[in-house]
């Protein structure tokens, strides 16, 4: 089993989402010892934001690419191949200004490739990255999930659910720690709840794998 571990928080060791992704990966490895882990730090190894040079190789153009286009194509190819090779993807997604970090958005722009992660058909778009499990470690300074107003301001989890679904990923799970900037007690409670969610997601996947094996 191949697991891709992605972090995107700019705050390094102070990051809650990085703490949660590390806990998730360790729990997954404990439950699935044969798992092979690849790591992508989108702050240390950030893809450039999307440009025409990055887009050109994906519009059917194969000959006569400029040096800049070839460089950007190599970056996009590395990232999409890494994503497609993974059975499980763990994504650290902190809540920045009501959405996700620009580094994570730049990664999504690179892997959103027609013919690779999705295609358009006579019946509409079809995702091509089916069969993956994605666990998103979502961290928020405030609390946005418990009120209609808060949910209306949230373009982090909802966006990731949408774009991953567009890629064909139907098994998207969220480990959420919110209210982490609302005092020590609130942060401790949020981290405890997130730890329980990690355990539940890993156990649920292991139980489902056991059922599949028995059915086979």
UniProtKB/Swiss-Prot annotation:
Note describing how the cofactor binds: Binds 1 FMN per subunit.
MF-aspect GO terms: electron transfer activity; FMN binding; oxidoreductase activity, acting on NAD(P)H as acceptor; oxidoreductase activity, acting on NAD(P)H, quinone or similar compound as acceptor
EC number: 1.6.5.-, 1.7.1.17
Keywords of this entry: Flavoprotein, FMN, NAD, Oxidoreductase
Catalyzed reaction equations: 2 a quinone + NADH + H(+) = 2 a 1,4-benzosemiquinone + NAD(+); N,N-dimethyl-1,4-phenylenediamine + anthranilate + 2 NAD(+) = 2-(4-dimethylaminophenyl)diazenylbenzoate + 2 NADH + 2 H(+)
EC class (word): oxidoreductase
Residue numbers binding FMN: 15-17, 139-142
Domain of life, per lineage: Bacteria
Cofactors named for this entry: FMN
Signal peptide: none
Function: Quinone reductase that provides resistance to thiol-specific stress caused by electrophilic quinones.
Matches recorded under HAMAP family: Azoreductase_type1
Subunit field text: Homodimer.
Similarity section: Belongs to the azoreductase type 1 family.
Entry protein name: FMN-dependent NADH:quinone oxidoreductase
Organism: Acidovorax sp. (strain JS42)
């Amino acid at each position: 089993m191949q697991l891709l571990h992605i972090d995107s928080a700019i705050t390094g060791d102070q990051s809650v989402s990085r703490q949660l992704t590390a806990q998730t990966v360790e729990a997954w490895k404990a439950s699935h010892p044969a798992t092979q882990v690849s790591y992508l730090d989108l702050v240390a190894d950030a893809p450039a934001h999307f440009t025409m040079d990055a887009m050109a190789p994906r519009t059917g153009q194969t000959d006569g690419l400029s040096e800049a286009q070839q460089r950007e194509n190599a970056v996009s190819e590395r990232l999409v191949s890494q994503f497609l090779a993974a059975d499980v993807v763990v994504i650290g997604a902190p809540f920045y200004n009501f959405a996700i970090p620009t580094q994570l958005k730049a990664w999504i722009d690179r892997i959103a490739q027609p013919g690779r992660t999705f295609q358009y058909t006579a019946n509409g778009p079809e995702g091509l990255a089916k069969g993956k499990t994605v666990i998103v470690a979502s961290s928020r300074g405030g609390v946005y999930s418990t009120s209609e107003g808060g949910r209306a301001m949230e373009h982090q989890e909802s966006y990731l659910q949408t774009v991953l679904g567009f890629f064909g990923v139907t098994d998207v799970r969220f480990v959420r720690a919110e209210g982490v900037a609302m005092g020590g007690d609130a942060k401790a409670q949020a981290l405890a709840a997130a730890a329980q969610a990690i355990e539940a997601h890993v156990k649920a996947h292991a139980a489902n794998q056991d059922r599949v094996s028995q059915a086979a």
